[in-house]
């Protein structure tokens, strides 16, 4: 019960409170780019997708941490979630700077990711960590695509994405080192398909 109450409190904070970063944003000190209205809209849409990804990361780690009985793994998951809070704050700042907004479907994304994390952790800690590896690898590839699509004048957003990509890859490496099992191919395919639906929807809504 305590774990569920903590998860509910974290969900409310993630979805409705202003996130506070423990580390300064990589965008700090960088000038805002001279973007056309179309470029600004596209940069905002891309950053909204990234913000959704961080909402989902929070939910995924919380769902896993609520289930695992291994204190060391729980601490590892919560530390990763704290780093994702930095990402959440940084992407929220970029959304505001670009005159954009978070996805209106964030509660839905959060609920789905929490359920996935909870379910994966019910199987085994190794499967749970395998889910982290695959998720973070997919996010890192997705961020690489955003580095290529983001208007080059938006140095602030590019700096944030580059840092996030490095952090996500490190999370994947840490999870593998902690004993992650490889997910079966059908699970990876389903995850990629779900990610495509999420990113396409969040780009607009």
From Swiss-Prot:
Amino acids binding Fe cation 2: 84, 136, 168, 171
Enzyme class: oxidoreductase
Metabolic or biological pathway: Cofactor biosynthesis; ubiquinone biosynthesis
Entry's Gene Ontology cellular component terms: plasma membrane
InterPro entries according to UniProt: COQ7_proteobact, Ferritin-like, Ferritin-like_SF, Ubq_synth_Coq7
Alphabetical GO biological process terms: ubiquinone biosynthetic process
Cofactor note: Binds 2 iron ions per subunit.
Cofactors (names): Fe cation
Recorded GO MF terms: 3-demethoxyubiquinol 3-hydroxylase activity; metal ion binding
One family name in Pfam for this protein: COQ7
Primary localization class, coarse: membrane
The reaction(s) this protein catalyses: a 5-methoxy-2-methyl-3-(all-trans-polyprenyl)benzene-1,4-diol + AH2 + O2 = a 3-demethylubiquinol + A + H2O
Bilayer topology annotation: Peripheral membrane protein
Localization annotation: Cell membrane
EC numbers on record: 1.14.99.60
Keywords from the named record: Cell membrane, Iron, Membrane, Metal-binding, Monooxygenase, Oxidoreductase, Ubiquinone biosynthesis
Binding-site residues, Fe cation 1: 54, 84, 87, 168
Family per similarity comment: Belongs to the COQ7 family.
NCBIfam families named in the record: DMQ_monoox_COQ7
Main function: Catalyzes the hydroxylation of 2-nonaprenyl-3-methyl-6-methoxy-1,4-benzoquinol during ubiquinone biosynthesis.
Protein name: 3-demethoxyubiquinol 3-hydroxylase
Organism the protein comes from: Paracidovorax citrulli (strain AAC00-1)
